[in-house]
UniProtKB/Swiss-Prot annotation:
Entry's family note: Belongs to the P-Pant transferase superfamily. AcpS family.
Record-linked InterPro entries: 4-PPantetheinyl_Trfase_dom, 4-PPantetheinyl_Trfase_dom_sf, ACPS, Ppantetheine-prot_Trfase_dom
EC number: 2.7.8.7
Pfam families: ACPS
Location(s), subcellular: Cytoplasm
Cofactor(s) recorded in Swiss-Prot or TrEMBL: Mg(2+)
Transferase as UniProt keyword: yes
Organism this protein belongs to: Campylobacter hominis (strain ATCC BAA-381 / DSM 21671 / CCUG 45161 / LMG 19568 / NCTC 13146 / CH001A)
Described purpose of this protein according to its UniProt entry: Transfers the 4'-phosphopantetheine moiety from coenzyme A to a Ser of acyl-carrier-protein.
GO cellular component: cytoplasm
Name of this chain's protein: Holo-[acyl-carrier-protein] synthase
Enzyme class: transferase
Single GO BP term: fatty acid biosynthetic process
Length: 124
């Protein structure tokens, strides 16, 4: 299954300005919050938009959206040693949706963050 999402960085800026840490607590795990903690403001907004888009793309790949079946904190978008994003999925989500493999890509351009997620799920 494939999920794709695009989000305006200015939209994330408005939400973050209005709600601050409450917004971060709603969409980011502790590890994700630590990953953006010391970034300058513009880079932080870009990273937040990328994470948000990746989580929305993940939900779309599951076919459920953000819902009772899947929430923002059920997957973490982290970076490996080379700076490439990867998914850390809650074990209950892996089991519930029979996820065997997951890949994510995030890009930023022209004031937008775009993400694609590919999930390989078994039928049983």
């Amino acid at each position: 299954m494939i999920g794709i999402d695009i989000v305006s960085i200015s939209r994330i800026s408005k939400i973050y300005t209005k709600f601050g840490d409450k917004f971060l607590d709603k969409i980011l795990s502790g590890n994700e919050q630590n990953s953006v903690l010391n970034l300058n403001y513009n880079l932080k907004l870009e990273r937040l938009a990328g994470i948000y888009a990746a989580k929305e793309a993940f939900a779309k790949a599951l076919g459920v959206g953000i819902s009772a079946d899947f929430g923002f904190l059920d997957v973490e978008i982290l970076k490996n040693d080379r700076g490439a994003p990867f998914l850390e999925i809650a074990p209950c989500i892996i089991k519930k949706f029979n996820i065997k493999n997951a890949d994510v890509s995030i890009t930023h351009d022209g004031g937008f963050a775009i993400s694609a997620v590919i999930l390989e799920m078994s039928k049983f």
